[in-house]
C-alpha cells in the first residue's frame, strides 16, 4: 500500500481530491468506508476534539487500523481541528495518521511557534515509530460551526481570506505538510446559500507555498466550485455538516 502522502500526491497529479469525512459513530464510519471501497478511492476519517472525546481516541485508532489492515485498504485517521500542542500530541501518540492544528485565533507569530512545535514532534514520533505522520494547519478565518446557520458569520469575507504572501511565510516558518487556507469557504451550511469559493486564490497560494492544500467547510458548496478549486490546487476536501 502507498503512504498517506503518496495518495495525496497521486490525487494531485490526476487532478482529483481525497474526501475527508468526520464521524461520531460506527454507523457513519461504515457507510463512508463502504462507499469508498465501492468507488475504489482512498479515504480520510476525521475526528474533532469533541468527536474524539465522544468516540474515544484509542477506539477510533483501533477501528481505522483494523479496516486498513484487514482489507489492505487506504483509510487514514486525522485529528481534525485540535487547538493546542497537547491535544495534537495525545492524538498522535494514540496512533492518528495526521493532525490539524487550528490556532487562527492566536497572533500569527504565536500560531507559528506552536504549529512548528507540532511539526517537530510529529517528525520525532515518525522516526521513533517508523510511520508517516502529517501535520496540517489552518490559516485565515473560516468560521467555527458545523451546523446549519441562518447567515454567514460576521467577519467572513474577502478581507479575511488567506493571502499568498502570508501562506508562504507561514509554511516556510513552520514546515507543515498541508495547509488549509481561507479562500471563501466557511464551516457549516447556510440557509441563504454558501459563499462562492475563489479558485484563483487557491492557485496563487499553491504556487506560493508548493504544498498540498486542503478545503475545509466543504458542506453545501456547489459542485462546480469544488471542481475549480481542485484543478487550482486543492488535494483534500473536508465534509462534516452535510453528513
PLM segments and residue spans:
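A C-terminal functional module that forms or caps the active site or interfaces directly
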Residues: 241-243
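Alpha/beta enzyme core
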Residues: 3-14, 24-51, 58-76, 82-211, ...
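Glycine-rich beta-strand-to-loop/alpha-helix junction loops that act as flexible
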Residues: 216-219
Amino acid at each position: 500500500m502507498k503512504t498517506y502522502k503518496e495518495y495525496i500526491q497521486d490525487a494531485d497529479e490526476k487532478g482529483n481530491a481525497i474526501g475527508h469525512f468526520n464521524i461520531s459513530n460506527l454507523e457513519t464510519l461504515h457507510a463512508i468506508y463502504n462507499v469508498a471501497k465501492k468507488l475504489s478511492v482512498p479515504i480520510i476519517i476525521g475526528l474533532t476534539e469533541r468527536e474524539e472525546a465522544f468516540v474515544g481516541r484509542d477506539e477510533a485508532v483501533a477501528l481505522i487500523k483494523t479496516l486498513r489492515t484487514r482489507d489492505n485498504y487506504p483509510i487514514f485517521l486525522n485529528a481534525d481541528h485540535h487547538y493546542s500542542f497537547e491535544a495534537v500530541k495525545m492524538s498522535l501518540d494514540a496512533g492518528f495518521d495526521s493532525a490539524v492544528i487550528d490556532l487562527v485565533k492566536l497572533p500569527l507569530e504565536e500560531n507559528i511557534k506552536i504549529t512548528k512545535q507540532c511539526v517537530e514532534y510529529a517528525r520525532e514520533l515518525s522516526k521513533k515509530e517508523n510511520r508517516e505522520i502529517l501535520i496540517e494547519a489552518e490559516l485565515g478565518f473560516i468560521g467555527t460551526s458545523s451546523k446549519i446557520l441562518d447567515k454567514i458569520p460576521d467577519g467572513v469575507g474577502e478581507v479575511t481570506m488567506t493571502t499568498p504572501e502570508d501562506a508562504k511565510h507561514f509554511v516556510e516558518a513552520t514546515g507543515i505538510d498541508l495547509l488549509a487556507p481561507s479562500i471563501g469557504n466557511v464551516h457549516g451550511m447556510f440557509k441563504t446559500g454558501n459563499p462562492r469559493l475563489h479558485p484563483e486564490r487557491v492557485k496563487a497560494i499553491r504556487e506560493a507555498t508548493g504544498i498540498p492544500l486542503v478545503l475545509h467547510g466543504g458542506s453545501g458548496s456547489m459542485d462546480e466550485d469544488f471542481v475549480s478549486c481542485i484543478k487550482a490546487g486543492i488535494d483534500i476536501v473536508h465534509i462534516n455538516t452535510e453528513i
